[in-house]
């Protein structure tokens, strides 16, 4: 029995309003979409993507593909990109100087 089944069995009578998903992986937008779609179908509840991030690859292109898609899904109610601290790594929303948005920060801010 998986953890989801154990939780749902033990939570008899609980009111669950939404489920929370995290995603960290390479820049494969279709994999991200498939993961969240399967997650939603598994629980049949609205999804809050409270953490997601790109661990390798082109974060700019990834965000350009997934942000409009998430906005178009009525079952995705919230989302938050995880890597916000100042960094020279182009997978963070804040530039190294801490004074401006990185390229993906600008994409996220205008989505």
Which residue stretches match the model-derived regions?
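Substrate-binding cleft of secreted/luminal carbohydrate-active enzymes
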Residues: 50-111
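Conserved small/polar residues in nucleotide/adenosyl-binding loops
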Residues: 1-5
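Non-catalytic accessory regions flanking glycosidase/transglycosidase catalytic cores in CAZymes
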Residues: 13, 41-44, 110-111
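Charged/polar, solvent-exposed surface patches and flexible loops
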Residues: 6-9, 34, 38, 68, ...
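Structural recognition of alpha->loop->beta junctions
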Residues: 7-20, 67-77
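Glycoside hydrolase catalytic-domain groove-lining segments
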Residues: 21-61, 71, 75
């Amino acid at each position: 029995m998986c953890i989801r089944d154990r939780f749902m069995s033990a939570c008899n009578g609980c009111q669950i309003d939404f489920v929370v998903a995290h995603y960290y992986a390479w820049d494969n937008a279709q994999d991200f979409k498939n993961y969240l779609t399967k997650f939603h179908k598994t629980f049949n509840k609205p999804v809050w993507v409270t953490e997601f991030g790109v661990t390798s690859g082109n974060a700019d292109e990834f965000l350009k593909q997934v942000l409009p898609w998430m906005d178009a899904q009525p079952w995705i109610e919230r989302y938050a990109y995880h890597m916000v601290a100042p960094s020279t790594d182009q997978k963070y929303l804040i530039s190294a100087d801490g004074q401006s948005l990185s390229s993906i920060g600008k994409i996220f801010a205008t989505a």
